[in-house]
Amino acid sequence: MNIYKRLKQDIDVVATSIINKLKSTSDSKKFDSLNDTIPIVLESSKDVNSYDISTNIAMLIAKKMNQNSITLANLFKKKLSHYPYIANITIAGPGFINFVILQEAWTNYLAIILDGSYRKEYSSIGNNKKVNIEYVSANPTGPLHIGHARAAVYGDVLATLLQCTGYQVTREYYVNDTGVQIDNLSKSVYLRYKQAITGQAADIPKGLYPGEYLISVGTNLAEEYGDKLLTLSEPEYLNIIKDVAVNNLLQSIKADLALIGVRHDVFFSEKKLHDSNVISKVIDLLSVKKLVYTGKLSQPKGQSSDNWQPRSQLLFKSTIFGDDQDRPLQKEDGSWSYFASDIAYADNKIKRGFDYVIFILGADHIGYVSRIKAIIQALDSNQDVTLDIKICQLVKLIEDGVAVKMSKRSGSFTTIRDVYETVGKDVIRFFMLTRKNNAVLDFDLVKLQEQSRDNPVFYVQYAYVRAGSILRKAKDNANIAYEIFSTNKSDFSLLSTKEELNLIKILAVWSHMLDGAVKNFEPHRIAIYLQKLAAEFHALWNLKSRDLDYRFIVLNDNNLTAARLALATAVREIIREGLKIIGITCVEVM
């Protein structure tokens, strides 16, 4: 069993007995309903020379039950000190409990890694619960820029992480294929079509899409229709162009996502919601719940009175669910608003029976968080669905030390394809996970082409390659040691140097780290972990240049060599597993 999982279970048993004893001796009735399952958090030590694992459980119980945290910490120490895998327990600060784990417990964990059974520690976390993850969902009005890649990679890796931990996952893309922006797209394409027919450069008015990426769409229309569209009225030619334009750009988006290994199971059309009359039915349902009314909105903050004309309109009572204002359901022309479409789309997700619904939004959509929460609360009366909304912050593309400004509307942006052709899929995917999703990320094209520690994916892949080279050399030059290793007879207790044990401790935290990553929807933890593992392995490798005793292959000591071959194999196994989840290639030679 994983050391962290075992320690957590043992702490839980002791915590439950302590809480129950405190309840039985307390006169206060407020403790009667206290939940026994206070969360147990285990943290790996940042100072491996003093202790291995720490917990603040005593402080949490003390706060909830008005007790002295140091006294409770010492009680934990007394009850846990006799466990055979625990070498020592110390109390620090206001009540942190620090554990030193027996060396044998760490080294024995290598066997669990080598036989692959470590995956069982997290493969059933999800218990087959159904999850819908919606990510990217960029309007099909142009190619995806590098900023879109962040939500794309985050969503794709989160989906893989959930799948490998026992969830049933649907990867979804919501296609906004109707509305004003699609009208503007179609008008822009029409001008490019005229350009192809007449040979005269198109004059693109402000508010439309001037990007040259639409020239090919216009040319294709000219080849298919000739000059026929020039004879039609605007409503007639726009009706033809809309579907062609959306389909062309959606196919382009899918192709760009495929370049960086991102996929979706479902592309859900907003237009179909409008065409099927579903929106009206959902609004009627909310009306029955008395959540819809006709009223007037207050003047938006910052808008001039000269430009504001209050009007009676159909509104959704989103403020009762914590939103900052009620939301309009219809536009001035009587058609349904984007918000009304969002309600119908959310209702569709709920009816598909998902246990979790995850929305991944860009930083420019932070304002949607409160309204999405209001929608789900209004529709999901039984609270059958758990909602989570994740925000992916901006990506600042850096070229030659200067930030590149991007705007799809102006036609000035760096596409995913541009960056892919410069650095490749693996660099894009890994680097998008080097910071938490809600932190701004600087994407430096120059540094990410270097074969150095500044290029994190190279650094991790190189650790995998180095470990593989050790095994190949041993197979050729240390036959006896390789035979001991390959027949699973390695003596792990021989791995006793401080550096070897530090590396093993990092390997042992993999399952614990992954448990936290999936439960918090934070796949960036995997990338951070892999960098730490690679750094520790490279550090151990480099020691041989100063001290030959640190060589992985010690020709006069077959048993030690066999043990170190097992260690190198364990490093490769965990790196392989981590890169597989992130969707990055494991290379054998660099």
Swiss-Prot record:
Gene Ontology molecular-function annotations: arginine-tRNA ligase activity; ATP binding
ATP-binding keyword on record: yes
One Pfam family hit: tRNA-synt_1d
GO terms for cellular component: cytoplasm
Motif extent ('HIGH' region): 138-148
Subcellular location: Cytoplasm
GO BP: any one term: arginyl-tRNA aminoacylation
EC number(s) reported in the record: 6.1.1.19
Catalytic activity: tRNA(Arg) + L-arginine + ATP = L-arginyl-tRNA(Arg) + AMP + diphosphate
Domain of life of the native organism: Bacteria
Keyword terms: Aminoacyl-tRNA synthetase, ATP-binding, Cytoplasm, Ligase, Nucleotide-binding, Protein biosynthesis
Major enzyme class: ligase
Classification via Gene3D superfamilies: Arginyl tRNA synthetase N-terminal domain, HUPs, Isoleucyl-tRNA Synthetase, Domain 1
Keyword set includes Protein biosynthesis: yes
Family statement drawn from the similarity comment of this UniProt entry: Belongs to the class-I aminoacyl-tRNA synthetase family.
Subunit architecture: Monomer.
Name the record gives this protein: Arginine--tRNA ligase
Gene name, Swiss-Prot/TrEMBL: argS
